[in-house]
C-alpha cells in the first residue's frame, strides 16, 4: 500500500484542527475584547438576570452528631444568559459552543447560607459551557459543610431533617433572580451510604423582605433532606451484646447457692459489661441535648446487672441464716414455704421437715427388761427406791441431757433448712422475674420507635 494516501489524510486532519482552533481563537478574542466580568450581563441595568439553580447530590460524606455538621459532596448547576457573549456560528466556522474558564466571566455569587465549617462560596472554578446564544452552563463541584440540628433522641433508629440554603451574597432579587431547576435535587448519581439512606428530598424558593428595605426581596433556594439511619451496625455490635449480658445476669439465679459461685458470676458479668461499654462509648453521640435510645438501654442494662448483684447478696444471706442469728417471722414461713410453692407448682422442691420433738422423754413408769429380752420385774414408778438411788438418778439425768441436746440440734437443723428453702424459692422467683424484666425492658425501650417507623413505611 502506498504511503501517500495516509499522509494526505493526516495533512487534511491537521489543517482542519488548525483551522478549527483558529476560529475558536478569533471567537474568544472577539468575545472578551471589551468584556468586564464585574458587570451584570444585561442590555439595560433595570433588567433582572435570571439564574436557574440545580443541586446534584453526589455523596453524603459524614454526619457529625456532636458538632451538628453534615458534610456532602455536591455539584451546583447554574444556568443564565450573558447578553455580551453571543455570536453567529457561520462567522466562526460553525463553532456553536466553547469551554472557557469561569474566572473570565460574570458569575452569580451563590453561597451556602447555613455553612457550618468550611468555605461559604464555591472554591473550585471549573470551566463553563458557553453556547452561541449566550446561554451559560456552569456545574462546579463543591464540598459543603452545612449546619443541621441533629436530634439523637431515637438513636440509632433516628431520622434527621437537614437542609442546604443557597442564595446570592451581594445581589438582591431586583437584580438577580434565582429559580430552582426542579422541586427536587438530582439524586441520579448519588452514591449510597453505608449508614444513611435518603427517604425524601425537595427544594423550594424563598423570598424574604426586611424592615430596612421592604420593597427589596432577597431570594434563596432551600433543599431539604430527610435522612434515615441504617441501624444494623448498632443492633449487631451494641444492642444484641447488651441483651445477652442481661440474660446472663438472669442466669445467676439459676445457679445453686451451695456452689459458692453466684457472686463470682455476678461480678464477672458486671466487669465484662463495664469493659464492653468503655469500648463502644465512642459509637454513641456524645451530646447533652437528649439521651438516645441506645444510651437508655445501656443504662437499663447496667442498673439491671447491679440490681442482680444486690439481690444475690440478699439471697446468699438468706441461705446461710441460722436460728442463732435470725428467727424466721411467721409471714416469711407462710409466704415462702406454705403459699408460693403451692401457687407456682414447686412440687419437685423438697420442703423442710417441721416435726417437733414434743414427745415426752420419760414416762411415769420405767419398764426394766432383761437384756436378753425376757420379761423383767414389774415396772417401777418414780417413787421406787431404785429410782432414788444416786447412780440411777445420775444416769437418768445424763439421758435427759442427751435427749434435750438432740432435740435442740434437730430444731436448729430444721430452722436452717427452712431458711435454705426460702432462699431456693427466692431464686426460682427471681429467675423468672429477671428474665421477664429483661424482655419487657428491651421492648419498652425500642418497641415504640420501631412501631412508629413501621407505620411511616
Swiss-Prot record:
Disease field: Multiple pterygium syndrome, lethal type: Multiple pterygia are found infrequently in children with arthrogryposis and in fetuses with fetal akinesia syndrome. In lethal multiple pterygium syndrome there is intrauterine growth retardation, multiple pterygia, and flexion contractures causing severe arthrogryposis and fetal akinesia. Subcutaneous edema can be severe, causing fetal hydrops with cystic hygroma and lung hypoplasia. Oligohydramnios and facial anomalies are frequent. The alpha subunit is the main focus for antibody binding in myasthenia gravis. Myasthenia gravis is characterized by sporadic muscular fatigability and weakness, occurring chiefly in muscles innervated by cranial nerves, and characteristically improved by cholinesterase-inhibiting drugs.
Coiled-coil spans in chain: none
GO annotation, biological process: acetylcholine receptor signaling pathway; membrane depolarization; monoatomic ion transmembrane transport; muscle cell cellular homeostasis; musculoskeletal movement; neuromuscular junction development; neuromuscular process; neuromuscular synaptic transmission
Keywords of the record: Cell membrane, Congenital myasthenic syndrome, Disease variant, Disulfide bond, Glycoprotein, Ion channel, Ion transport, Ligand-gated ion channel, Membrane, Postsynaptic cell membrane, Receptor, Signal, Synapse, Transmembrane, Transmembrane helix, Transport
Effect listed in the UniProt record for changing residue 275 to A: Increased length of channel opening
Documented effect of changing residue 305 to I: In CMS1B; abnormally slow channel opening and closing resulting in abnormally brief current
Glycosites: 161
Official protein name in the record: Acetylcholine receptor subunit alpha
Places the protein is found: Postsynaptic cell membrane; Cell membrane
Residue ranges that the UniProt entry lists as topological domain Extracellular: 21-232, 286-296, 449-457
Amino acid at each position: 500500500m502506498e504511503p501517500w494516501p495516509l499522509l494526505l489524510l493526516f495533512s487534511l486532519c491537521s489543517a482542519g484542527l488548525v483551522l478549527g482552533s483558529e476560529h475558536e481563537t478569533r471567537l474568544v478574542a472577539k468575545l472578551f475584547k471589551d468584556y468586564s466580568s464585574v458587570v451584570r450581563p444585561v442590555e439595560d441595568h433595570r433588567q433582572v438576570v435570571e439564574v436557574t439553580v440545580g443541586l446534584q447530590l453526589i455523596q453524603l460524606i459524614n454526619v457529625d452528631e456532636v458538632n451538628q455538621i453534615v458534610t456532602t459532596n455536591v455539584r451546583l448547576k447554574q444556568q443564565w444568559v450573558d447578553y455580551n457573549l453571543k455570536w453567529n456560528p457561520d462567522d466562526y466556522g460553525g463553532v456553536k459552543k466553547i469551554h472557557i474558564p469561569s474566572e473570565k466571566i460574570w458569575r452569580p455569587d451563590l453561597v451556602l447560607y447555613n455553612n457550618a465549617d468550611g468555605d461559604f462560596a464555591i472554591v473550585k472554578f471549573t470551566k463553563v459551557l458557553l453556547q452561541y446564544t449566550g446561554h451559560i452552563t456552569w456545574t462546579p463541584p463543591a464540598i459543603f459543610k452545612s449546619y443541621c440540628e441533629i436530634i439523637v433522641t431515637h438513636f440509632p433508629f433516628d431520622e434527621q431533617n437537614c437542609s442546604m440554603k443557597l442564595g446570592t451574597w451581594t445581589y438582591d432579587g431586583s437584580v438577580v433572580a434565582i429559580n430552582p431547576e426542579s422541586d427536587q435535587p438530582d439524586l441520579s448519581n448519588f452514591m449510597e451510604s453505608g449508614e444513611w439512606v435518603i427517604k425524601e428530598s425537595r427544594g423550594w424558593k424563598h423570598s424574604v423582605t426586611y424592615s430596612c428595605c421592604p420593597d427589596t426581596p432577597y431570594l434563596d433556594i432551600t433543599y431539604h433532606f430527610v435522612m434515615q439511619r441504617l441501624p444494623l451496625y448498632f443492633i449487631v455490635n451494641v444492642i444484641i451484646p447488651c441483651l445477652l449480658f442481661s440474660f446472663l445476669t438472669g442466669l445467676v439465679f439459676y445457679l445453686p447457692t451451695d456452689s459458692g459461685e453466684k457472686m463470682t458470676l455476678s461480678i464477672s458479668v458486671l466487669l465484662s459489661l463495664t469493659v464492653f461499654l468503655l469500648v463502644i462509648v465512642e459509637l454513641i453521640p456524645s451530646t447533652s441535648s437528649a439521651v438516645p435510645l441506645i444510651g437508655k438501654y445501656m443504662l437499663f442494662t447496667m442498673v439491671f446487672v447491679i440490681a442482680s448483684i444486690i439481690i444475690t447478696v440478699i439471697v446468699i444471706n438468706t441461705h446461710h441464716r441460722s436460728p442463732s442469728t435470725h428467727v424466721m417471722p411467721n409471714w416469711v414461713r407462710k409466704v415462702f414455704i406454705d403459699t408460693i410453692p403451692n401457687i407456682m407448682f414447686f412440687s419437685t422442691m423438697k420442703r423442710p421437715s417441721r416435726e417437733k420433738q414434743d414427745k415426752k422423754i420419760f414416762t411415769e413408769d420405767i419398764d426394766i427388761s432383761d437384756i436378753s429380752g425376757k420379761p423383767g420385774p414389774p415396772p417401777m414408778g418414780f417413787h421406787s427406791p431404785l429410782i432414788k438411788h444416786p447412780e440411777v438418778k445420775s444416769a437418768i439425768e445424763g439421758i435427759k441431757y442427751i435427749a434435750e441436746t438432740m432435740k435442740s440440734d434437730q430444731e436448729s437443723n430444721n430452722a436452717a433448712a427452712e431458711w435454705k428453702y426460702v432462699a431456693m424459692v427466692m431464686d426460682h422467683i427471681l429467675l423468672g422475674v429477671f428474665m421477664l424484666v429483661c424482655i419487657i425492658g428491651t421492648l419498652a425501650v425500642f418497641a415504640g420507635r420501631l412501631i412508629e417507623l413501621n407505620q411511616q413505611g
